[in-house]
Amino acid sequence: MSLQPFFGFPPTVNDLFSDFVSYSPRLNNQIPGELSPSIDVHEGKDTVSVDVELPGVKKEDVQVHYDSGKLTISGEVVNERKNESTEGNQRWSERRFGSFSRTITIPAKIDADRIEANFSNGLLTVTLPKVEKSQTKKQIAIK
């Protein structure tokens, strides 16, 4: 029996391991089937604040709903150019389009009647005032 030199894995295997090792939540929109906006949740003395990155999304394409301690942000990223002709041009697109929904468990009792949502420059900020006794359901209008 003789030993043969090992020259490494084929490129596809190396790419598979590189992608796996470098995966992070910031890259979640590059995984097929996943469209999930990035969020930050801040809990202060009187409020819980949720910031949601929604670049390229219109306010009217987003819904915010609060139900029994869970905040759901849902909507759709619409491809405005999908009907444009690409004849004669090479087309490259790394942006994702389609529906999304993200549900967050809020770590405090919330006054559902005072929840506010503001949308500006692709950032949705939902402010949830804390209260000792919480309500269970509320649809929130975005300003």
Curated annotation (Swiss-Prot):
Organism: Schizosaccharomyces pombe (strain 972 / ATCC 24843)
Family affiliation: Belongs to the small heat shock protein (HSP20) family.
Extra information: Regulated by the spc1 MAPK signaling pathway.
Subcellular location: Cytoplasm; Nucleus
Transmembrane segments: none
One GO MF term attached to the UniProt entry: protein folding chaperone
Keyword entries, A-Z: Cytoplasm, Nucleus, Stress response
Gene Ontology process terms (BP): cellular response to heat; cellular response to misfolded protein; cellular response to unfolded protein; protein complex oligomerization; protein folding; response to heat; response to hydrogen peroxide; response to salt stress
Domain sHSP: residue ranges: 30-143
UniProt-listed InterPro entries: A-crystallin/Hsp20_dom, HSP20-like_chaperone, Small_HSP
First-listed, main subcellular location of the protein, grouped into a coarse class: cytoplasm
Induction: By heat shock, and under conditions of deoxyribonucleotide depletion and DNA damage.
GO cellular component: a single term: cytoplasm
One protein family per Pfam: HSP20
Name listed for the protein in its UniProt record: Heat shock protein 16
Domain of life from the UniProt record: Eukaryota
Signal sequence region: none
Keyword Nucleus appears in the UniProt entry: yes
